[in-house]
Amino acid sequence: MSESTRHGVVSDGGKFADKAVFRSFVKPADFHQALLDIGAVPGNNMNKDNAETTLTEGSNLKLTFTWKDQESGKDINDVIKDSNGNPIQIRFSGNLDNANEKKTGCITCLDSCLVGITSNASYPYGSVEKAKTVEFNGNMENFPLDGEPVVITYEVVE
């Protein structure tokens, strides 16, 4: 995972699955509902008019990654590197209508997003691909082998 991407986790059936750091078997609508079920509150504050100047809102989420020989789990900031050294701050962005319409499959975006169910409140939309103010890459010191099954746990934190 040496090539920079803004696509952290994408549903296997989504249009952007081939661009993701991790592919998931969950559908965006099911994932959205699961977050509601654990008490997360969606931000739903981004749209095409404000995306490049707005940071996503919604419940703060902790992501923990576990895989074979790493059962204790690793935080997203240990698994994915931000080129600026800023913490990745995943929020429950919401965006269910946009996700259903666009069919990208985006579960977790690495900058704020108006389509992804969750996204990073550290950067506005376009920071990776358009403005190029940040790059995200896998931290190979804390990264599963290619093709290794990974469990990603999302937890609401205050």
PLM feature spans:
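Long, low-hydrophobicity ectodomains and other hydrophilic envelope-associated domains
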Residues: 1-158
